[in-house]
Amino acid sequence: KEKFKYKELIFMFQKELADRILSEESSKNYGRLSILSNWKFNIKKIIDINPNSFFPKPKVKSTLLSFVPKKDLFKFNNVENLEYVTRIFFNQKRKKIKKPLNILFSKEKNLINKLNLNLDLRPQNLSKETFFKITKEYENLV
């Protein structure tokens, strides 16, 4: 278990960025940021903040987010592997997942079968947990 020195972090983001952090699979905003930021934290929206709440008034809306460390964290040898795996998948997010899986597991085709994934899916259709499992399998090879 990882030890954190805090119970909760509160951050304010531009609303569009907060929407990307909070997005779930199959939504248009879902991507690397959603997966990477939700790996270590349970993230919840607290409130949207109107530009009229500030002086001078910004041209964008803001969102307050709560980040609570996860108690049961998916363990990686190196978080850079998760960054690499998500980059491979989301560089061509409109393509099917067969190509990035072949890039990651080119010498171990049986691992693709072991993951038991529908190869006709696109990266935005895979859950965060699926990306964590793919990364763990990738780490076992490198």
Model regions and ranges:
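Intrinsically disordered, Lys/Arg-rich low-complexity segments
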Residues: I134
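Class I S-adenosyl-L-methionine
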Residues: K1-P123, K128, E139-V142
